[in-house]
Amino acid sequence: MSPDPIRRKGRKTLAKVYDSLTDPEEAADRSRIIGLPTKKEARDIRDELTAAAWAAGKTVSRIQTAKEYISIAESFFRKLRAIKNTETRTPQTGIPSLRELLRDTRVTNLDERERMIETARADTAILLVGGKDLRGEGARILLILNETRLKMGKTTILLAHGTEKDHKAVLPAYKPKFYRR
């Protein structure tokens, strides 16, 4: 039984996203940026879409905001770099590979790695995105996450709140449909 239709200005957009979470034929358009609601509206929409995805029997990433994902990713790779730089390099061992570093207990015991993997593997990732998340390093991290998920055939929904100018930097490289209210 599907929940009540979403009643708000952007309901056509949200209905389309809801359909793509439940209907296999609608799943071709896997990634999208939804904008431009207020932050509070974006939170409400995220909760509705999360409930819709769960109702459709999909796993949903527990990371709730793009800012949180970006900080986890930055922290994780910062630690990887620090370990790589401090490792002793001998002619026999050479420079440690990424695979070796991922086995390192200083990295693999971190909750961040589990949460990054969970976000990459969940059927549906719904991230609340602020303007700062779509500029510079944050935009790059989100693009990499999206490309990884697209290759796996997974749905990524970025709920962008703020002003349209905040999204111009990421949109040309991004290529999903950009839904306006």
Residue ranges and their predicted role:
Residues M1-P5, A82-L98:
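Glycine- and charge-rich intrinsically disordered segments
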Residues D29-G35, T93, T124, T155-I157:
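Residue-level preference for the first positions of well-ordered beta-strands
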Residues Y18-E25, L49-A53, L80, K84, ...:
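Hydrophobic, Leu/Ile/Phe/Ala-enriched alpha-helical segments that form helix-helix packing faces
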Residues R11-V17, I45-D47, N109, L142:
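Well-ordered, non-membrane alpha-helical segments in soluble/globular domains
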